[in-house]
Design a protein with these regions (language model features):
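Flexible, low-complexity linker/hinge segments
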Residues: 1-5, 137-168
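Conserved AMP-binding/adenylate-forming core of the ANL superfamily
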Residues: 3, 20-65, 69-73, 90-95, ...
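Structural core segment of the AMP-binding/adenylate-forming
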Residues: 10, 49-50, 77-152
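Conserved pre-ATP/AMP-binding loop-to-beta segment of ANL
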Residues: 19, 131, 152-173, 180, ...
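Conserved AMP-binding A3 loop
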Residues: 32-34, 169-193
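A short helix-loop-beta submotif of the ANL/AMP-binding
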Residues: 56-57, 63-83, 87-91, 99-105, ...
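Conserved AMP-binding/adenylation subdomain of ANL enzymes
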Residues: 192-209, 217-257, 267, 271-272, ...
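Gly/Ser/Thr-rich phosphate-binding loop
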Residues: 230, 255-260, 269-328
Length: 328
């Protein structure tokens, strides 16, 4: 008997093994793996009630929130395909990607409700629009649905269709710098093997707490939307990349791991001293040696195309430790 490879199994496993462990932190919201899994199941049921079935596309325009994280499980487990869109794009790009992917449902964060409403008339294939947060009365009157309300009224049971490992899981679009955005088609097996490859190179455990400095829409957050769950760790959402928020969460949430592009790492390294002092009381900071070897033991790993040597040197100097290449 063959078992299809799918990252959906990681959440089912986490629910069995780590039911009461903290799974998600998003500002004031905290969810255990049991609670997170049940929310995903209810959203799956709600989508089926809205007419979403196997093969249908569901588009998301949102920063790193618990609702976006839920989409990486709730949508594919009914055989539908997630289309996470770069929220930094313009309205024309949103319209193109949604239309090209054939999305049947659009889910948008409060910052993008108005722009989606403006392009709705260009998207005849879209049957439902869902506000993940911040639904206003005018938009409600225009037919928008409120995510949390729909979720509340949905059951936890839904129809699980047979899913093959070569079925589509997500379609991730490029930014279209040289032409129209192009969709990269990721299957369940693609995602599963990427997760396994990452876990081989990066040792993680249920004690790890991952900070979402990397956009979830970007290559499915380098598959960490599933990697962290596979390890039974905690997802700590970061809605906007801002050094003060990053240092505050590192301190308050006991962050053990984050991923970031060189631009973000440079922003962290260049943060004003008063921002970096968030990590320690002033009296403790003043006693620190300037030698990197005596600072916090931070491991810096590079993957894919590594940052410039100057960037790595600066990060090592500011945070301490040495970097190493973990995978191609």
């Amino acid at each position: 008997m063959e078992t299809p490879l799918s990252p959906l199994e990681f959440l089912r496993r986490a629910r069995r093994l780590y039911s009461d462990r903290e799974a998600v932190v998003d500002e004031d919201l905290r969810l255990t793996y049991s609670e997170f899994s049940r929310r995903c199941d209810r959203w799956s049921a709600a989508l089926q009630r809205l007419g979403v079935s196997k093969g249908d596309r569901v588009a998301y325009i949102a920063p790193n929130t618990h609702a976006l994280l839920e989409s990486f499980y709730a949508i594919p487990q009914i055989g539908a395909v997630l289309v996470p869109i770069n929220y930094r794009l313009i309205a024309d790009d949103f319209a193109y990607i949604i239309g090209h992917s054939g999305a049947k449902v659009i889910c948008a964060h409060s910052d993008y409700l108005e722009v989606v409403e403006r392009i709705r008339q260009e998207l005849p294939e879209v049957k439902h629009v869902v506000a993940l947060e911040g639904l206003t009365d005018p938009l409600r009157d225009a037919g928008w649905l409120d995510y949390e309300t729909v979720l509340e009224n949905a059951p936890e049971t839904f129809t699980r269709p047979p899913i093959a490992e070569d079925d589509l899981l997500t379609i991730n679009y490029t930014s279209g710098t040289t032409s129209c955005p192009k969709g990269v088609m990721i299957t369940h097996r693609n995602a599963y093997m990427n997760v396994v490859g990452t876990l081989i190179h990066i040792s993680m455990s249920p004690a790890d707490r991952y900070l979402w400095t990397l956009p979830m829409f970007h290559a499915n957050g380098w598959t960490f939307v599933w990697v962290v769950t596979a390890a039974g760790g905690a997802h700590v959402c970061l809605r906007k990349v801002e050094p003060r928020a990053i240092f505050t969460l590192i301190r308050d949430e006991g962050i053990t791991l984050l991923c970031a592009a060189p631009t973000v790492l440079i922003g962290i390294a260049n943060a004003p001293e008063d921002v970096r002092r968030i990590l320690l009381p002033a009296e403790a900071w003043s006693t620190l040696s300037t030698k990197a070897s005596e600072r916090r033991n931070v491991r810096v790993l590079t993957a894919g195309a590594p940052p410039a040597a100057a960037t790595i040197e600066r990060i090592e100097g500011e945070l301490g430790g040495r970097s190493r290449r973990c995978m191609a």
